[in-house]
């Protein structure tokens, strides 16, 4: 049935009048405790321009009533606005993601779209990202200088970064046409009906998270040739307007490269690849292969220790949730298989009494600084053991906050070694009285081998945070909200106390398992869903939930009882 022409004209007129009324009305918002009014449809970018002078660093996103918004969006409802700068974690990641888009556009423009088959973002190097290029180009200083010059030109022009929503099928077709086969495979397993595509002029791509509204925000970066590719060097979060000097760490880079090469060998270097293997073969075989690889690596480390000769102190350090405790147990078993007598010691047992623990800037106990350890007593005990004396070792009572002695005596024989685990173990200030030739240093971290796709990496800190959320809930009854809330403090402690010493290690061990996020997903999702949108941790919880949604879930029944992953999901054979 069709409306007659007169009625249709009347309805059109009334709808137009209603739109005009909407467009003419003022919208009230609360900003920094002030009530402000703006015309309906004002862009958030225009509002930001009014307040930018109050902030030291660029405002790159905002929060409207607990919901993240990009600055090209328009104001349509009343509410509260909070600004997010490039020094805030979410804003900082938005900046890094946006510069990555800028680089990809420049590489294809300078190199020629027909000449570049694939650009892959791999892992973090120095303060940036390591990329490789597969194509008919010569990657040298001349090419890199042209790319950088074009990036700076785009920054100067303030080119809009546009966003459009398309159906998943259309997105997959677009990815296929652009030869982004990793993305095409990834979205085959996605349950969402629509996908956000970002474009910078003619270059189109998908990114895991929000972007800057235009290239004018992206002033701070540098490019360096490194290994077989290039590094996009970016600011650190604490100083987002400064690009630090390029300072690669060759040992950790080599471990990351070896892990990535292994993932490529088994054809599972992206989340789409992993999901495909799970659907076609099941996860059991992949679990067994990954666990066998780790066991072989641990055995190799044990052999290196034996061959090094007379190393009485095996010093193990690594960031939070790297699996240090399970690793030390498995290494001890391998050492025993080589005829040695390992004795595990936790540096935590040498904490000073609670009342003597230093405080951080917020007045909370700082258990992560070196001063929280009784370094003098630790050195006296270790030196005495090295001299062949019998020593009574302490146990720290975490309930009373006191160090206790309960007759735990130890004397080292010829085959005895101490397997010492603690965040400061690579710092020679902890063991200054021990000869360097008596120590064998091991750095352990969960260096995720997988990428989401060729242009979206998985930060190693995300894998460790998800491990920590699952373990804290199981062992301490801690909420995901509490774990997320203290994570930045943990990260600051790692930056100060662990990462500066990692290159001093004799050997490095990657504890990440290629299948682990598919398992952790089933444990972490219910915990993350418990965080409500009114809580400050909601944005991070929502980001992690979106991230985990890329993975197909895998039950934990097939995981061996001695797996490092058991330290987090439970039912392991070690007392950790």
Write out the residue ranges for each language-model feature.
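Conserved lysine of the Walker
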Residues: 324
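Short beta-strand-centered segment that lines the nucleotide-binding/catalytic pocket of NTP-utilizing
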Residues: 337-355
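Conserved nucleotide-sensing/catalytic segment adjacent to the nucleotide-binding pocket
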Residues: 356-399
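Auxiliary tRNA-acceptor-end handling modules of aminoacyl-tRNA synthetases
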Residues: 73-76, 80-94, 106, 110, ...
């Amino acid at each position: 049935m069709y409306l007659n022409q007169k009625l249709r004209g009347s309805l059109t007129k009334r709808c137009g009048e209603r739109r005009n009324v909407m467009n003419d009305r003022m919208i009230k918002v609360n900003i920094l405790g002030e009530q402000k009014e703006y015309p309906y449809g004002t862009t958030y970018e225009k509002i930001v321009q009014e307040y930018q002078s109050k902030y030291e660093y660029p405002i790159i996103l905002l929060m409207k009533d607990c919901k993240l918004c990009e600055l090209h969006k328009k104001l349509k409802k009343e509410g509260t606005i909070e600004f997010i700068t490039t020094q805030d974690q979410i804003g900082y990641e938005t900046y890094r993601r946006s510069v990555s888009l800028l680089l990809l556009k420049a590489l294809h423009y300078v190199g020629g779209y027909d000449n570049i088959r694939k650009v892959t973002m791999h892992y973090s190097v120095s303060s940036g990202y390591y990329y490789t290029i597969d194509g008919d180009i010569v990657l040298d200083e001349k090419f890199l200088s042209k790319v950088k010059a074009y990036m700076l030109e785009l920054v100067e022009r303030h080119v809009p970064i546009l966003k459009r929503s398309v159906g998943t099928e259309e997105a997959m077709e677009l990815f296929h046409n652009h030869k982004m086969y990793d993305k095409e495979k990834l979205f085959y397993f996605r349950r969402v009906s629509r996908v956000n595509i970002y474009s910078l002029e003619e270059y189109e791509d998908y990114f895991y998270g929000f972007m800057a509204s235009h290239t004018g925000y992206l002033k701070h970066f540098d490019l360096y040739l490194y290994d077989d590719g290039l590094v996009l060097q970016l600011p650190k979060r604490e100083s987002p307007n400064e690009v630090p000097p390029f300072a690669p760490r060759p040992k950790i880079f080599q471990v990351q490269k070896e892990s990535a090469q292994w993932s490529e060998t088994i054809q599972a270097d992206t989340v789409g690849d992993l999901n495909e293997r799970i659907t076609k073969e099941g996860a059991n075989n992949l679990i067994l292969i990954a666990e066998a690889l780790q066991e072989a690596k641990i055995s190799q480390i044990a052999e290196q220790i034996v061959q090094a000769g007379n190393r009485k102190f095996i010093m193990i350090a690594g960031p939070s949730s790297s699996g240090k405790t399970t690793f030390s147990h498995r290494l001890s078993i391998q050492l025993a298989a080589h005829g040695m007598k390992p004795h595990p010691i936790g540096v935590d047992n040498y904490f000073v009494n609670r009342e003597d623990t230093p405080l951080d800037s917020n007045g909370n106990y700082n258990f992560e600084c070196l001063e929280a350890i009784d370094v003098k007593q630790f050195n006296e005990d270790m030196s005495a053991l090295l001299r062949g004396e019998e020593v009574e070792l302490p146990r720290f009572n975490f309930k009373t906050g006191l160090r206790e002695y309960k007759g735990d005596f130890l004397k080292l024989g010829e085959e005895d070694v101490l397997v010492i685990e603690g965040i400061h173990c690579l710092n020679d200030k902890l063991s200054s009285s021990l000869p360097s030739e008596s120590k064998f240093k091991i750095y352990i971290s969960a260096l995720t081998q997988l990428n989401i796709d060729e242009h979206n990496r998985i930060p190693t800190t995300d894998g460790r945070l998800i491990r920590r959320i699952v373990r804290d809930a199981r062992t301490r009854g801690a909420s995901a909200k509490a774990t997320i809330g203290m994570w930045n403090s943990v990260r600051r402690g790692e930056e100060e106390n662990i990462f500066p010493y990692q290159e001093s290690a004799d050997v490095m061990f990657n504890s990440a398992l290629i299948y682990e996020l598919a398992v952790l997903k089933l444990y972490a999702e219910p915990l993350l869903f418990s965080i409500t949108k009114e809580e400050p941790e909601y944005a991070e919880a929502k980001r992690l939930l979106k991230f985990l949604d890329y993975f197909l879930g895998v039950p934990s029944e097939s995981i061996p009882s001695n797996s490092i992953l058991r330290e987090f999901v439970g039912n392991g054979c070690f007392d950790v």
